[in-house]
Amino acid sequence: MIDPVVGFLAGGLLDLAWWQVLLLTLGLTHITIVSVTIYLHRSQAHRALDLHPAVAHFFRFWLWMATGMVTREWVAIHRKHHAKCETDEDPHSPVSKGIKTVFWQGAELYRAEARNEETIARYKHGTPDDWIERNVYNRFGILGMASMLIIDVLLFGALGITVWAVQMAWIPVTAAGIINGVGHYWGYRNFESQDAATNISPWGIIIGGEELHNNHHTY
């Protein structure tokens, strides 16, 4: 009785080597990055492209499980960031709030602004407002993240808890900390934009192209 349980906890359903779990974890986090940059950022916030409904809903579903974020909140906060960039009203500017605050407390700044009903009401236009958004994704973000935890443990065993923790930390670290913080504080500039946005790296691979933040704020 005990041996099967120990065996399951040691490897889960997939029973992979540690390096295979590492590669899969990085792959899963990249799906999250792609979901944020293509769906939330380019499609929803800036209306730069239209996605097939099936593709758009896959991104919504994945983000519900991998981040617990609500589309209208992310979009509204990002639009306000562009509208009020580097001012005291910017939700996450290191120019007004300090680089240490944005880098280490970026997720807290996001959650605080998500509770600002005026921000959401003013900047949420055009975001999904269907039944599943109102009754599932918007109301039960914790259920999505809990579902991801269960899936990770089933697939990877006890190591799935670590996989899940990395997934949950990925956007707070890369987006809230690195892009919103470092991307307005340190790096190089291809263009003289009216804000402090910088390019962190010329290769937009790790964070889905968001590393080229000066380019984005200019165009």
Predicted region positions:
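Active-site-proximal inter-transmembrane loops
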Residues: 124-131, 186-212, 216-219
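Non-catalytic, topology-defining segments of multipass membrane proteins
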Residues: 1-178, 182
